Structures are given as structure tokens and as C-alpha cells.
Amino acid sequence: MATTTIQARTSYVAKSDTIKQDTVKHDSIAADTAKVEKPKKETEYEKIVKKGGTVMKGLFTVRHIEDKYYFEVPDSMLGRMILCVNRFTAVPQNFGKFAGEEANDITFYLEKRDTTQILVRQYVLTQIAKEGDNIRRTLQQSTINPIVMDLKIIGHNEANDAHLVEVTPMFKGNSKLTDLASSLKTSLKLGAPQNNTTFIDTMKVYPNNIEIVTTRTYAAQNGQSPASQTGNITLGMNTSIHIKTDNNRYYTQP
């Protein structure tokens, strides 16, 4: 009788251990499944891109999503000299300028400050040493160009190693790159651009340049043009952005 009792207790303990082991295995499998099924967090770049819109590839990859324009700026474009030329395409009668005339031109370059911001610097230096001279690097490191605007880095395109920035204010707002020079606005008696009646009409992208057509409305004082009597002057403008040669690159590394 004693032998039978001991065998029964031993059998009972073995079954209990098996149930515990099976429970542990089941919990482990459930935990692994939960890890696999956890969705990947969407990046800021993916959030913007999934909205669709138009994509144009050239000097920069340009995205037109809803009413905003974005550039994808690769690291290879940082420090490159870019020429921005603004011309009148349509003007009021007796305005003092004619369609086709150049309004102004500016040379600028992009500089990455950190992971959140790209600076736009206007190149205004007039003292340039000869290429290869020792003084050239010293001159570039001891002088500084003005920051005319900044671009917030919204996201990053891992495939092209490019930074996504919104450029709508660059072409629509009171931007130093595309706005008329202060001296010209003074002579034409123009005030600040009116945001609600200033538009980006088209943006066309090519391998070496980008062409932007805008309609710009300025507050105006009484001038020689009859249109100024309304308090506003509306202009048709074309902005041409193109890269300069490789020799014209601003030195940004020590």
C-alpha cells in the first residue's frame, strides 16, 4: 500500500510541472507575437509624402503637396553657389519698368546648422583671393555672409540622403531672395508684398535650374502708374534658380 501511494504523488507532481512549462512557453510565444505585430512608427518624411501631390526631379527634387512646395536638399548641394535671377513678366502701364527686364539677382548658398535647420546665406563678399593662394582659406574663414532666411528640416529621405524643407515662403513671402530690392521698391513707391494676393503660379524643374512663375501684389503709394491709385500694384515675376560651376563653392569645412 505504501508503494502505491508514493507512485501516485510522484505522478501528480510531474503533471503539475508540465502544465507550468507549457504555460511559460505559451506566454513566451504570445510576447514574441506582440513584438512582431507592433507597427513601425511613421517618420515625418513619410507623413508628408503619403499625402501625394506632384513630384518633380531635377536640380532639387520638388514636391507640390496641397498649397505648399517642398525641396529635398541633399548634402551634396550644401555650400554650392546658386544664382537667383528675378525678372518682370508683366507690369502695369506707366510702371517705369518693362516685361523682360531684370529686377535683381542674388547669389546664395545653403548651410546645414544642425539636424533641424538649414540656413540660407547670401553671398556678398567682394574680396576674393586667387584659387590656390594660402590667403584664400584664411579670408573665407575670417569673413561671414548674412543669413537671409532659415528653412526648418521637416524630415529626411533616407534613400537619397536628402533633407525635406518647405520653400513656399521663399517664393511667396517677403523673402530676400525673390523680393524686389529695397532701393527699387522705394523708387517705385512700393510697400510690402500682400500675402493673400501673392501666388506661386507654376514651378518647373530641370537638371540645372528651376523656373518659378509668381504673381506678386504690393501695397503702393500714389505713383506714376494709374494702378497705384488703387493702393496696390500687381506684378508678374519669373524667378530662375540655377547652380553655378563647381569652382564657385563656398568653403564650409576647416
Q: Where do the language-model regions lie?
A:
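Bacterial Sec-dependent N-terminal signal peptides
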Residues: 1-16
